[in-house]
């Protein structure tokens, strides 16, 4: 497939729109091979289905890296963190869960990097630094993903077990 090919299927009176997109290559997120155009379709998807060749399972790493680089977080929940900018009062940090990856100094430093000097920050999830930065960027898509293995008839059972390590949870 060299172009995005749309299709519609009907299931239980629901019309489901499907886009078959070209294979994702290294550098797609930076525009190589019309990659940004192709990956932008995935940003708005309700589900990403990756068809993975069992003879080249390492390709999943390229796909995951390129999706991450363009701001798609497959099979991740959006962090439950609220940042409300305000006019005065400095940065107020509160949390309903223990924060094991962030401390107050790091949070304030990251907030300041984004030019916010007055904000209320509420953590309802224990997030990493990268997840907190994703919250502040506000341009990430959290999309469920399914990985399908293609050509399973060409590998034996032992190899199928080995393939499981390539498939993300």
Which role does the model predict for each range below?
Residues 139-140:
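Short, conserved loop/helix-junction motifs that constitute active-site signature segments
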Residues 48-49, 145-147:
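Short, well-ordered beta-strand core segments
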Residues 48, 54-56, 74, 78-81:
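Internal, well-ordered alpha/beta segment that forms a basic, Gly-enriched binding/recognition surface
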Residues 3-7, 11-16, 21-49, 55-66, ...:
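Switch II of P-loop NTPase G domains
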Residues 41, 58, 69, 80-87:
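Solvent-exposed, non-transmembrane amphipathic alpha-helical segments
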Residues 75-114, 118-127, 143-146, 152-169:
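Canonical P-loop GTPase G-domain recognition
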